Amino acid sequence: VPNLYLQLEMLPIDITESDNQKFDSKDREVQKKFAPYFKHRGIDLGTQHAFYRDFCLATRHCEDGHRDICLAFPMALPQNTDRIVGFEECGRARLDGQDSYKGMAEGSNTDEGLWIASPARTPLAEAKHIYWFGSAYDAMAFYQLHRAQNQELRKAVFISTGGDLTEKQMRGVLEQTIP
C-alpha cells in the first residue's frame, strides 16, 4: 500500500468522527477488505467468523481529503455491553513504514472500557470462563490456537484491556461476574 499521507504522525481515530463498516459473515467482498488486517497476524477466516460482531473497519475522513482506516475493536463498559465507549485500534500503516499503529481511539474511555466478546454471545454475567488479554488480536489468536481442542471455548468470554489493566476495568468485570 503506497504511503499517501503528508502528516508526520498518525493520529488516533475519534470515535465520534468515524464511519464504521462491520464484517459481514456472508459477503465475501466485504470480508476481503478485512483480510490485510488479519493476514499478518495469521488470524484465519474461521476465527474472523467467530468474532465477526466484535470488530469493524473505522474510517476517519480528513480535511485534506484522505482517509485513515484501521481495524477497530469496540470497547464497552461491563455493566452495559451495548454501549460503545471507545475503540482499540490496530493495523493502520505508520508513515515511517515500520510496524502498524496500535492504540486507542481518541475519546475512548480507556479507564473503564473493555473489548468484551464471545463467539456464542455468552453474556458476561453468565460466563463460566473469562479470558483476559492486552489486545483483541491476542484474544482471537488464543481462540484460534485452542478452539479445536476445547469446544467449550466458543462459550467463553474474551476480554481485552487494550493495553494495561486498570483497577476500574477489573472492578467492572468482577461486579458483573461475582454473585
Region roles according to the model:
Residues P2-N109:
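Basic, glycine-enriched DNA-binding surface that flanks or lies within the catalytic cores of DNA
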Residues D64-T177:
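Phosphate-handling DNA/RNA-contact segment within nucleic-acid enzymes
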